From Swiss-Prot:
Binding positions for ATP per the UniProt entry: G13, S14, G15, K16, T17, T18, R119, Q155
Pathway linked to the protein: Metabolic intermediate biosynthesis; chorismate biosynthesis; chorismate from D-erythrose 4-phosphate and phosphoenolpyruvate: step 5/7
Protein's name according to its UniProt entry: Shikimate kinase
Keyword Kinase (UniProt): yes
Protein species of origin: Nitrosococcus oceani (strain ATCC 19707 / BCRC 17464 / JCM 30415 / NCIMB 11848 / C-107)
Stated role: Catalyzes the specific phosphorylation of the 3-hydroxyl group of shikimic acid using ATP as a cosubstrate.
Gene expressing this chain: aroK
Amino acid sequence: MLNFNIFLVGPMGSGKTTIGRYLARITGKNFYDSDREIESRTGVSIPVIFEIEGESGFRQRECKIIAELVQLNNIVLATGGGAVLAAENRRELSQRGIVVYLYAPPKQLYRRTSHDNNRPLLRTGNPLERLKCLLKERDPLYREVADVIIKTGKQPVKAVANEVLRQLRQYKGGAPQRKSFVHVKSNKGA
């Protein structure tokens, strides 16, 4: 049994919510998505929060939610793509669980997010270029906070989740060896 919280970080479209839900189901943990928690508590969507409060207002809400959620036990938490921008979030995540960075190349992120209108940072003339810029800015922060880095791509959710679990099980009874990098090979049958 995995007796620690699992926190997923990575860019928008990397699969944090989808993989997080699956991980929670197969580990018996409770699943939380920090963005959905913010929407649930405010009663409005992330784009509306960005429109009214700007990104800085949203980030303040995000810090409060993450500080609260990391206090829970037996959870899988999918964070927002920009959660790592705040040093306090990185500190809280590192101290309260195992952090898994789900990495995907920008073109893959673009394919996954291109039809999603709920991403205010991609409301630009060139969303692919914006994704590249965001990843360039945030990748060092994801890597700083990560205990494990899993490169995703076109792999099925089950294959990625199973690789995350395989890596996490190595930590049973002890602290992880930080910065393991794993590339999950595509497995069509998984």
